[in-house]
């Protein structure tokens, strides 16, 4: 059970702990072997590492359903610029996209580099919507990201050394649909938006219980 969760959501949830240097595909394979899904799947999954995924807030095809790295992190550990340890723990995890949660909380714990003696603890609280930009989603220009350490900072505020991620379950039935568009690219782009909206809350596809697991556009 992840910290800060009460009520119906307070139940054991599958997670996976990884070192920063683990290749993304190896994590996906380990999750798959356990019947689960690791949501972070950038196109560089065969070469990228977990630490880089956090530092870049990586996403991928499954980000449509479960969000980017930030949405799926339960805990991570860093070395700060002063050489001490920092552990960041997501509280009240919604097991989905972070911007859909009204208030988001992180517990930050600092420890001495040599003795691991606690140096301080604080709770970082912010609106979930602050993690995304209206009409854009992931905002790569927002390096501050509400003050959340490590994520999307590209290594500028410390070194990621380990992380724990929530895992998901794919629906029992899946289908792959291929659509062809002809004519100008500008005519295809609105169709992509319409397809995505169709499966969002309020869309007819979503109302029918169908989820969009991931889109690919060529």
Region annotations inferred by a language model:
Residues 189-213:
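Acidic-enriched catalytic cores of C-N bond-cleaving enzymes acting on peptides and small amides
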Residues 6-9, 211, 216:
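Compositionally biased, intrinsically disordered low-complexity regions
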Residues 56-59, 214-218:
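Short glycine/threonine-rich loop-to-helix capping motif typified by GTGT followed
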Residues 1-9, 14-198:
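FAD-binding subdomain of flavoenzyme oxidoreductases
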């Amino acid at each position: 059970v992840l910290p800060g969760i009460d009520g119906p959501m307070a139940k054991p949830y599958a997670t996976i702990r990884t070192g920063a240097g683990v290749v993304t595909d190896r994590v996906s394979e380990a999750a798959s072997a356990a019947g689960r899904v690791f949501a972070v799947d950038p196109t560089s999954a065969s070469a990228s590492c977990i630490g880089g995924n956090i530092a870049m807030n990586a996403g991928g095809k499954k980000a449509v359903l479960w969000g980017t790295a930030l949405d799926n992190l339960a805990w991570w550990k860093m070395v700060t610029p002063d050489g001490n340890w920092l552990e960041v723990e997501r509280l009240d995890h919604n097991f989905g996209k972070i911007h859909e949660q009204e208030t988001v909380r992180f517990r930050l714990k600092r420890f001495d580099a040599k003795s691991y003696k606690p140096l301080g603890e604080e709770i970082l609280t912010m609106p979930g919507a602050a993690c995304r930009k209206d009409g854009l989603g992931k905002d790569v220009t927002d390096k501050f990201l509400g003050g959340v350490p490590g994520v999307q900072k590209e290594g500028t505020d410390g070194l990621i050394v380990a992380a724990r991620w929530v895992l998901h379950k794919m629906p029992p039935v899946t289908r792959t649909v291929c659509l062809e568009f002809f004519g100008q690219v500008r005519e295809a782009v609105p169709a992509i938006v319409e397809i995505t909206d169709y499966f969002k809350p309020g869309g007819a596809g979503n109302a029918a219980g169908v989820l969009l697991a991931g889109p690919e556009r060529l």
